[in-house]
């Protein structure tokens, strides 16, 4: 195997690894948003039974990121910079999951193209991790404000 072929192969593997990581971060954000919405509803007294909680949680887990973003916006006001990041992640997530390789397939055939794609996916992962941390902070703040007692 030539060095050039091996380099291209390894770089392609790296590209697909970052693509998978971007999808993972997207799913982790969906989970975190579902958690936050359910906690908001618990804090508001909208969940009166464990069965109702489980039912609502299952529904949230089947919602798309867009549905979760719209719903969470009804209950919680994010600072403008966080809302901008949330919208950016939502838009990029949809692009990555639905159109990324359709639109960028030709870039995968060159080293320059693959490097550009890897950098783009790395940036998405960094942005998603930042949003994840912000959502966790808001979730912990709300959790600490409410008094959850085991029954």
Task: Name the predicted role of every residue range.
Residues 68-83:
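Short, solvent-exposed, charged loop/turn and helix-capping segments
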């Amino acid at each position: 195997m030539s060095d050039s072929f091996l380099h291209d192969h390894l770089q392609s593997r790296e590209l697909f690894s970052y693509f998978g990581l971007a999808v993972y971060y997207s799913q982790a954000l969906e989970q975190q948003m579902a958690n936050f919405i359910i906690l908001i509803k618990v804090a508001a007294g909208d969940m009166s039974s464990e069965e109702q909680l489980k039912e609502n949680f299952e529904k949230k887990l089947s919602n798309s990121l867009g549905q979760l973003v719209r719903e969470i916006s009804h209950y919680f006001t994010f600072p403008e910079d966080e809302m901008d990041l949330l919208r950016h992640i939502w838009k990029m997530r949809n692009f990555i999951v639905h159109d990324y390789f359709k639109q960028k397939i030709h870039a995968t055939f060159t080293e320059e193209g693959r490097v550009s794609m890897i950098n783009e996916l790395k940036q998405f992962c960094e942005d998603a991790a930042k949003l994840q941390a912000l959502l966790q902070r808001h979730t912990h703040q709300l959790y600490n404000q409410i008094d959850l007692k085991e029954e």
